[in-house]
């Protein structure tokens, strides 16, 4: 049976592919946007809701009867973190989530589940320690953002709605994110490790993170789900596999101090070590298509290896 699924952040890397997958399988993605002009470029979507996340009453009719709300909205963290921009990062997540929960509270027919994005930044810098969904939050700006973000989402439970939190790691796609930014350096033979190279990376193939959202839409449940593959790798291993998939060397190194000079505090997203395991994700019955990095790289970069 076709499901209506409301999405915020649908023009982002995950949102675009998720909306397309929903459409392809016969569901109805309903896109919420402050400015739906960009969203209307997604030919496979025909329901849009223009909303500034303030007064929800004018849009409630279009939100009634949705099976699930998917919250992917949030300003990119891949910018230099000035104090004003830190507030943008925080507010774009917490205020949007607050608005969604408020809208849900006013609906006559509430969704079965709110699936709200978070990040593995929740755990902070974990060094070589393995962490899973039961581990406590860490320290630092991103950890604080994730805590506030998740707390806001959990308020939907007060209205009888299940809440799934997806703590997403580094999403691999040649269409955006970290992988797209790293490919050019390798193509010009100057690719290599960032920082010490020993820091752990928790990654996930774009198809797997989209499938995880579909899994949670189809199986509404409370809980936290790490959106990462079961096989985290060190930065050195990551760039080696990237170079191998592109048939290019991975000999260069960018030292930590240079990254800090270039990006300031934001460099922590590259230099911090996170060895995150999707224990509860797998326990929920989700199966990864690409659990191993070499297989993921081969699939994602096959167009470059021809």
Model-assigned labels for residue ranges:
Residues 143, 147, 155-165, 169-200:
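NAD(P)-dependent short-chain dehydrogenase/reductase
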Residues 268-306:
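C-terminal amphipathic/interface module of NAD(P)-dependent oxidoreductases
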